[in-house]
């Protein structure tokens, strides 16, 4: 008996999908405006391909309340329905794990968090590779919102 796509684990992007903003921009605004001496380090890491490093640096310092973020309410209602019927839902984001875990805890329906860390920026093909490694090609659904999600959608059984 074949598995229905709606029964597969659903990986959900955070920035622009679950929330209507981007946590990197929020982190930059909340941290760098208050600590501008960190700007050269962020610029250097960005220019040398170490985006995950500056996300981690800002994630360690960032103080925010996940309840104050603007969530995609219609999508969140749909996710709540999927969760209540037993679907496994994973937060899969390029945001840093420190930040993503706070959002996931606030939302309260994610069974796991896959996120960037100090060394690995979980975006685009890297996110696709991580999801395929965990669930197999075509073994998951994916909800995203940008051109960075195309590589993930290509490997997913369900595209949202």
Name these PLM-found stretches:
Residues 1-7, 64-160:
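C-terminal cap/substrate-recognition subdomain and adjoining C-terminal extension
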């Amino acid at each position: 008996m074949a598995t229905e796509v709606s029964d597969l684990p659903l990986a959900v992007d955070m920035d622009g999908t679950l929330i209507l903003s981007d946590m990197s921009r929020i982190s930059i605004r909340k941290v760098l405006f208050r600590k501008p001496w960190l700007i050269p380090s962020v610029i250097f890491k960005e220019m040398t391909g170490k985006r995950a490093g500056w996300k981690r640096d800002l994630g360690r310092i960032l103080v925010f309340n996940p309840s104050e973020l603007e969530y995609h309410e219609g999508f969140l209602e749909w996710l709540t329905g999927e969760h209540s019927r037993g679907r496994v839902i994973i937060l899969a984001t390029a945001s840093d794990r420190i930040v993503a875990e706070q959002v996931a805890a606030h939302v309260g329906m994610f069974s796991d968090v896959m996120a960037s860390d100090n060394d690995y920026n979980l975006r685009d093909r890297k996110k696709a590779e991580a999801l395929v490694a965990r669930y197999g090609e075509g073994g998951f659904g994916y909800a995203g919102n940008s051109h960075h999600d195309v590589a993930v959608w290509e490997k997913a059984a369900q595209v949202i």
